[in-house]
Design a protein with these regions (language model features):
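Metal-dependent nuclease catalytic cores that hydrolyze phosphodiester bonds in DNA/RNA
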Residues: 1-147
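Mg2+/Mn2+-dependent nuclease catalytic core
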Residues: 133-234
Length: 234
């Protein structure tokens, strides 16, 4: 569960008392240079207003203090530019890969087949094995009061021994704009000490703390690239 600020509410591993934990994404967003992402968002607002004359007319009618109305115009402009459609498709593809990794009997729609095939082939080509028991797990780093949800753990060559943190990304420009933020997140996950299973804490399995993987599977492109990320600085 979360508090009103979006922080995880979880027991402290030492005291057992519930407390808020800062999200790993919040820490990463604060430390990372988000200029590229912010510029992308601004461009989408411009494109959305250009596509919707009614939004332009509404904007002209507003005064600077009409903040609520202006915020609604921005949201509508982003929708008009389909700024979030890629994210929705990416979420769907992400969930499909999770089901594939769990070995579920899944009838994959034709629209996703090339992407899923590319993902599976990339794992084979790089000798990677996803541990289905270690996907979407909440981990905590008590020293800094941080919690987050790691995407998946993988093994290189064969299951067992040291695992490596992996994060599947489906955005088009994630490697171009978001790698600093992602590296910070992955460093947090790799240095976490406890795993919350919904009832109690488990110990974090042994993972590499100097490297992690970004699995880039851009929606609709039928290709998948795996990038090794240096997370030692995190």
């Amino acid at each position: 569960k979360f508090d009103q600020y979006g922080r995880y509410i979880l027991p402290d591993p030492e005291t057992g008392e519930e407390r808020p934990w800062t999200r790993a994404t919040t820490v990463a967003n604060t430390l990372a240079d988000r200029r590229g992402l912010e510029q992308w968002a601004k461009r989408n607002v411009v494109l959305g207003i250009a596509a919707r004359p009614d939004l332009y007319a509404l904007a002209v009618s507003c005064k600077p203090e009409d903040k609520d109305q202006l915020n609604r115009i921005v949201a509508d402009a982003e929708e008009a530019a389909k700024a979030h459609s890629g994210a929705n498709l990416g979420t769907a593809l992400h969930r499909i890969t999770e089901r594939v990794d769990r070995g579920e009997d899944l009838d994959i729609p034709d629209a996703w087949r090339a992407d899923v095939d590319a993902y599976c082939q990339a794992l084979v080509d790089n000798h990677l094995i996803v541990d289905p028991d270690w996907m979407e797990r909440i981990v905590v780093l008590p020293e800094y009061g941080i919690a987050g949800t790691l995407d998946r753990l993988l093994y290189i060559g064969k299951k067992g021994g040291m695992a490596i943190i992996g994060d599947l990304k489906t955005g088009q420009d994630v490697v171009r704009y978001g790698m600093t933020e992602i590296a910070i997140q992955l460093a947090i996950y790799a240095n976490a000490t406890h795993v919350w299973n919904g009832v109690d804490y488990e110990k974090m399995p042994p993972v590499y703390t100097d490297r992690a993987l970004v699995i880039h599977l851009p929606v609709g492109q039928g290709r998948c690239e795996i990038h090794q990320v240096d997370i030692r600085a995190g």
